[in-house]
Amino acid sequence: MPLLKFCTALAAVSLAAAAHAGTPLYHLTPLTVPGATSVTVEDINDAGQIVGTYNDAGFVRHAVLWDAAGWHELALPPGDEVNGIARAINSAGQIVGTSDDFVQPTFGLLWNAATPGTYTVLNNDSGAPVLPADINDDGVVAGGWGVPSRAFVWTATDGLVDYGLEDPSVPDQQARWTAINASGKLIGFWNVHVADIHATVGIVGTPAVVGMGGASDTQRSNAVGMNAAGVAVGLASNDLQTLVPVVFADDGSFTEIAGATLDQDNGAAIAINDAGVIVGTAGIGTANGPVPGLQAWVYRDGTAYDLFTVVDDTTGFVRFANAVAINAGGVIVGTGRDADDNVQSFVLTPVAADPIFADGFDP
């Protein structure tokens, strides 16, 4: 059965068959591509369409889409050993990502799930690399471009518009957007080096990168994900050292997500859905961004859960590394490691509690 049909059917069965105390919170479905040595998921939309990349036996990366019909390779510019990554997908099935042959500058690409064999190049005439990070439901793309990186917004009407840096007078400063929502709010970061990184905010139509304010301007901080209401999550430090998963307030202050580092010292929140459920990673070492860590977690109903311990099956995985996206239905996608230490990916479908048990009846 195709992956997404299976997940949908499973969720329906779960309503009748799950779950009193001790029952797993999620059902695991591996994301696979025949012949792939590794699979790295990047995003899921509310329709359940999923994007990412897979590696073939020759170590070439391919941009890929999964939907109810199975998996589909996304077209890339011609060339030898062109590597592709699909980074984000919106509710309309528009996808953004990159291609790179390590000869030409990195191309930012826009695909449509309905026509995976065609693409639009987002680069302008500057010859600079373009790295999209997100696309909203209006088809507005945000990310970073150039070297050092500068924030940009792309629209079908205006093309690529440079949003610049937070402070152009600072030597070697770089900036990029990490997320954009339907209202046009932008979040991201500026940095000079690993130890000097700060969350930023912007709005589509005003080409500027602005510090988020408050503690985000004085402490290390990085805004990573955002929901439709504009609630941003990411990682930040209260001591200029340890970066932990946080939720940002509009004034730039932030609150640590209790328990989200699990048994690690650090971590990052990566995504938040409109219900306020947050997912991320724990154990990121010295990284200043949401790199794959040692554990993956979900924060729901005031509790952080180690996802590896609340799924019904971990076959094919020795551990989870991160949870990178969550849709409106609470379906989570993320990555882990197999027995050979290759990156593999999963879909976690919520197991809903049966009301007959929720009200206290126990046969």
Where are these regions (language model features)?
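N-terminal signal peptide c-region/cleavage motif recognized by signal peptidases
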Residues: 16-18
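Bacterial N-terminal signal peptides that target proteins for export
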Residues: 1-8
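Residue-level hotspots at or immediately adjacent to binding/recognition sites across diverse folds
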Residues: 21-355, 361
